[in-house]
Amino acid sequence: MGYGNSRSVRFQEDQEVVHGGESGVKLKFKINGTQINNVKMMSKGKFLKAKVLSRVFSEDLERVKTKILDPRGQTIRRWNKIFLIACLVSLFVDPLFFFLPVMRNEACITIGVRLEVVLTLIRSLADAFYIAQILIRFRTAYIAPPSRVFGRGELVIDSRKIAWRYLHKSFWIHLVAALPLPQVLIWIIIPNLRGSPMTNTKNVLRFIIIFQYVPRMFLIFPLSRQIIKATGVVTETAWAGAAYNLMLYMLASHVLGACWYLLAVERQEACWRHACNIEKQICQYRFFECRRLEDPQRNSWFEWSNITTICKPASKFYEFGIFGDAVTSTVTSSKFINKYFYCLWWGLKNLSSLGQNLATSTYAGEILFAIIIATLGLVLFALLIGNMQTYLQSTTMRLEEWRIRRTDTEQWMHHRQLPPELRQAVRKYDQYKWLATRGVDEEALLISLPLDLRRDIKRHLCFDLVRRVPLFDQMDERMLDAICERLKPALCTEGTFLVREGDPVNEMLFIIRGHLDSYTTNGGRTGFFNSCLIGPGDFCGEELLTWALDPRPVVILPSSTRTVKAICEVEAFALKAEDLQFVASQFRRLHTKQLRHKFRFYSHQWRTWAACFIQAAWRRHRKRKYKTELRAKEEFHYRFEAATARLAVNGGKYTRSGSDSGMMSSIQKPVEPDFSSE
C-alpha cells in the first residue's frame, strides 16, 4: 500500500488476474501503473508478458494514470448529488405529460402543442443525465468483495470487469430509465397510428409514463443510500433534510394530481361516448377530436345534440365519481397554470386526508385509484412526520437533553433540601455552561478524535492564549503544544471561589475571559489585607508550579496563599497537578535567570512579599532619616539633656524596630522554584 511520502505503490495480488509464467515470479510496476518490460526470470531466463493491473487501494488510485473513478472519491460524491437533483426533476417532469390532453367547450379533445414542445425539451435534458450516469458507471471502480482489508477493500479498476459487473446488475434499469420514450411516442409513433389519435395518446401516455416512472423512482433510493454511505447524510443541514422529505411528499401529490386530471379527461370522454351511443344514428366517435370542428356532419350534430348539458355531474346522466369536481370546475379546459395548481392542491388535500373525502362511483378502476391514494397517503405521511422529526430533533436534541438534566437537578436539589442561595448558584452555573458550550461535551468530542487531529485543534484553541501568558512567551512551539494538549476548559460563574486561602491547590488556571479578585489576609493576620485583580492573560495557582518543580516530589499538594473569587463569568484553561508535573519538567530547559525573573514579576505571591519588603525598607529608611535629623538638633543642647534625649531616642528605636521585624517575620518569603537543569 502506498503512503504519502513514498515514490512507489505496492498493490495486492489480484486473484482474478490470469498469471503468465510460473509461480514465484515478482512483477514490477511503475508509479503510473504500467508494467516494467523485460522482467528477468528466476532461473529459466524467460520473459513474461505484460500483466494488467486490476486492483488498487483507494488512496493509490490517484497515483495510477487511469480514467477509472473512485466510488468513494470526491468526484463521484458531487456527481451523485447532481444526479439526484436531475432524478427529482425528471420525476417532476414526467407526470406533466398527463396534462397534454385539453378539453374545449365544443365537446372535443386536443393536444397542447406549446406544452408538448416545452416538455419534450426538458425531458430530453433530463434524459441526458441518465445517459451520463450510464457512461460514468462504466468508468467507476467497485470494491472487490473477497478483498476487504480493515473494512476498506481493494478497488477493481479493470474496465472489462467493471463493465461485466455493471451489465449483470443495474445497467438494464438505467437503460430503461434513460430511454426517451414519451418524446418518440408523441412525435413519431402516435401520429402514424390508426384510429383516434386522442385515444391513442391518452392510453400510450398512461402506460408508458408509468412504465418508465417506476424504475426512475426506484433509482432514487439506492442513490440516496450511496450518498449517505459516502458522506453520512444526504443534506448537510437539518432544514435542508426536512425540505428534502417535504419535497418527496409534494412530489407524490403532484403525481396523484396529474393522474386525477388524465382520468378526469377519460371520464368526460366516456360520458360523451355513452351519449353518442344513444345518438348513434348521427353521432360518431371521431366528432370528439378538435381537428373535426370544420366537419359539416359534426356541426349539424353538435347543433342538434344536448351532449354538453347531459354530460355534467348535476344531470345524473353519468356517474363521474371522484372526477365530478374536475368537470364542474372546468379544470380540463382551463389554462395550464390554473389546472396544474388545482390538481396539485387536489392531490395534496386527499393525500393528507388519506382520501376520506372521496365519494367514488362503482367503477373498479376508480375505487382502486382511491385505495392507492389512501394507502400511499398513510405511508408517506408517516414517513414525512418521522423523517422531519428526525431532522428537526437534531437541532433541538441538545436543548431538550439540557432541559431534562435541569429538571433532574431541580428534583435532586429539592430532595436534598438545599438552601435557596445554593440552588440559585447551581442554576446559574448550568445556564452559563449551556450558553458557553451549547451542550457539547468538548472533552468527549476531542478524545474521540485521532491524536494528531486533537493536537491541531488544541493548538488552534489554546496556542495564542497560552502565548499571551508572560510566563510562557519564551517557550518554543513544541513545548507550547505539549501544554496545549493538557489544558482543559473551565467555566466559573460570578461569585464562585476558585480557591480559598489555606486550601490545597490542585490546578493552575490561565484566564481567557473575565476577571477575578485575588486577595490574602496573610493567614488571618489582623489588619493585613492585600488584593489584586486577575484578568485575561493572567494565571493563578502558582504555588502548584513551585510544588511541581521540586526535585524531591511530595504527595501532599501545596496550600493556597490567596483567595481567588470570580467577579463575573470567567472562561479559563486549567492545568491539573499531574499535567503540570510534565510541564514543569520542560521548564528546566529554559534560561534560569530569565524565567525566575518572569515568575517573580507575574506571581501575585511574590508581588505581595515584594510589596511588604519594600514597605518595611521604606519605613527603616524613614526611621534612619528621622534619627539623623534628631541627632543633629541635640548637639546644641547640654550634654545631660542630650544624653537623656539620646537615651529616649534609642528606646523608641528598639520599640519601632521590633515592630518592623515582626512584620517581616510574618510575611514569609515565597519558596524559590527549582528551575535548574536536572
Swiss-Prot record:
Membrane topology: Multi-pass membrane protein
Keyword set, alphabetical order: Calmodulin-binding, cAMP, cAMP-binding, Cell membrane, cGMP, cGMP-binding, Ion channel, Ion transport, Ligand-gated ion channel, Membrane, Nucleotide-binding, Transmembrane, Transmembrane helix, Transport
Extracellular topological domain residue ranges: 103-115, 192-203, 267-364
PROSITE patterns from the UniProt entry: CNMP_BINDING_3, IQ
Domain of life (superkingdom): Eukaryota
Any one of the GO CC terms: plasma membrane
Matching Pfam families: cNMP_binding, Ion_trans
Boundaries of every IQ domain copy: 607-638
GO biological process, alphabetically ordered: response to bacterium; response to calcium ion
Gene3D superfamilies: 1.10.287.70, Helix hairpin bin (1.10.287.630), Jelly Rolls (2.60.120.10)
Sequence ranges on the Cytoplasmic membrane side: 1-81, 137-170, 225-245, 386-678
Region (Calmodulin-binding): 587-602
Entry comment, domain topic: The binding of calmodulin to the C-terminus might interfere with cyclic nucleotide binding and thus channel activation.
Family: Belongs to the cyclic nucleotide-gated cation channel (TC 1.A.1.5) family.
Protein name (record): Putative cyclic nucleotide-gated ion channel 15
